[in-house]
Amino acid sequence: MACYIYQLPSWVLDDLCRNMDALSEWDWMEFASYVITDLTQLRKIKSMERVQGVSITRELLWWWGMRQATVQQLVDLLCRLELYRAAQIILNWKPAPEIRCPIPAFPDSVKPEKPLAASVRKAEDEQEEGQPVRMATFPGPGSSPARAHQPAFLQPPEEDAPHSLRSDLPTSSDSKDFSTSIPKQEKLLSLAGDSLFWSEADVVQATDDFNQNRKISQGTFADVYRGHRHGKPFVFKKLRETACSSPGSIERFFQAELQICLRCCHPNVLPVLGFCAARQFHSFIYPYMANGSLQDRLQGQGGSDPLPWPQRVSICSGLLCAVEYLHGLEIIHSNVKSSNVLLDQNLTPKLAHPMAHLCPVNKRSKYTMMKTHLLRTSAAYLPEDFIRVGQLTKRVDIFSCGIVLAEVLTGIPAMDNNRSPVYLKDLLLSDIPSSTASLCSRKTGVENVMAKEICQKYLEKGAGRLPEDCAEALATAACLCLRRRNTSLQEVCGSVAAVEERLRGRETLLPWSGLSEGTGSSSNTPEETDDVDNSSLDASSSMSVAPWAGAATPLLPTENGEGRLRVIVGREADSSSEACVGLEPPQDVTETSWQIEINEAKRKLMENILLYKEEKVDSIELFGP
């Protein structure tokens, strides 16, 4: 095998790494010592397993592959060390030429209970065996005059609608025929009274034949124009061939995006208002977003005023809800970034979906290919493991959300060629404590330490004043998205929603999701000890975190010199508490705290045990190496 290690398919590399990671430490170190003779570099790679939870075999092979090591060298080394099972994984793989084929149709015989991705894979397998496959079709709910102008491949009978768009499929055998079921999205769009399908003449007239004066932006896969129809503004996205695209890529891209758009119906997902599949061009029609993109507003494009913190947090909350909704439909967006978060006249975020993918159902379909110069523009929002391996999972979207949260928090662009490092993710991840400093992470949490440093160094100053606890909570949510491999979007959404409620000036009992230091499910366990960190329980510094501590350690109401309640958290809170939160107490008032002091070490251990049961931390991080 003359190919290089970095040319190994991702699924082969996955199997190999899983096998090698299961070796004893002695056997693995023996293998690694033949690859790397520099003990410092070897220890650095070995520490990644404990600090970052990555596959050390993958890191080792990546390091070796970047030095032009071949697959044959790897096989020879494995055989020399008598690691025959790992060697056989590579030997079972045979390089095969890439097969390019159009997106297959959905045959009528597909059973409704099968997921869409499984149906697609089945059709692909049939095509590889030489069986003919029909072109995919997408019916529009428009009127018959509009249908007269549709191309042939867009004029199927209603019973041939893709099964993936059927939302109310019956489960019992005595239910009505599947062919009469209409998707919710199509019902909603039909009620609007306008046809989804636009004729070529309508699009040309609305955009003045795609006049360059109407161009809003130019992207990798499409040009965006502004147009009008019946006095109403629209945005037209005209797909175009790229220098590296394969033949027929526009048709595949068009059909895939249309399929995704028709499945989505969420207030924070950009709706599709129409489409046009003409001979000269393919175009989508979207509502016009008066406030442009989040990226433009964060960078002050067009002289716009900086977004205030309540609006920033509200946009982040809407973005996270949109991604969580897509993941619930088993859709991976794969291109979440601030330029794809559009803002309407009310600054409500709408997530555009130019590169959405259906979640895969088998190992081979979990990987994607992307040309290098296209990847560079999106690499600022992609995790390192995706860039190296190409494995497309929900983790990619969650990581991208973390970068957008960081952009909102810091006001720093995700990519700046005049900055070192160029990518914001590298700037932030460099602030993760080193392996030596992270020894204290079992007590305070790496994300919390990282969040505090980010707030101290990079917090946006031009958007007004942000309470310290809110800033750290928002930064911690971003760090969880960037660092953890199994982050729960629901957990991050809850934290951002709590910050949003706080900034709106309301009392809230939303849980802090275990993100802020000093909270947790075990914090109500009384423990008397001498080694208590009194600084975290100091009553004089508890004003900033009082609204958030209510979910774990309820505070007793205290009175100022005038006899008015200063802080109230719990069922006894009345209407006067909301107006008094955040007021500084008179200097001559003595505060008394009746809180139970908690053994910090034991509390943190119990929290980690709960996280371990939820599979959010591994045993090495819990008990140490």
Curated annotation (Swiss-Prot):
Naturally occurring in which organism (per UniProt): Homo sapiens (Human)
Residues where ATP binds: I216, S217, Q218, G219, T220, F221, A222, D223, V224, K237, K337, S338, S339, N340
Tissue and organ distribution: Expressed in spleen, thymus, prostate, lung, liver, skeletal muscle, kidney, pancreas and peripheral blood leukocytes.
UniProt GO molecular function: ATP binding; molecular adaptor activity; protein heterodimerization activity; protein homodimerization activity; protein kinase activity; signaling adaptor activity
Region of interest (Disordered), residue spans: 111-181, 510-540
Name of the protein this chain belongs to: Interleukin-1 receptor-associated kinase-like 2
Subunit organization: Interacts with MYD88. IL-1 stimulation leads to the formation of a signaling complex which dissociates from the IL-1 receptor following the binding of PELI1.
Gene name as annotated: IRAK2
Keyword Nucleus: no
Residues modified as Phosphoserine: S144
Stated role: Binds to the IL-1 type I receptor following IL-1 engagement, triggering intracellular signaling cascades leading to transcriptional up-regulation and mRNA stabilization.
Family: Belongs to the protein kinase superfamily. TKL Ser/Thr protein kinase family. Pelle subfamily.
A single GO cellular-component term on record: cytoplasm
PROSITE patterns named in the record: PROTEIN_KINASE_DOM
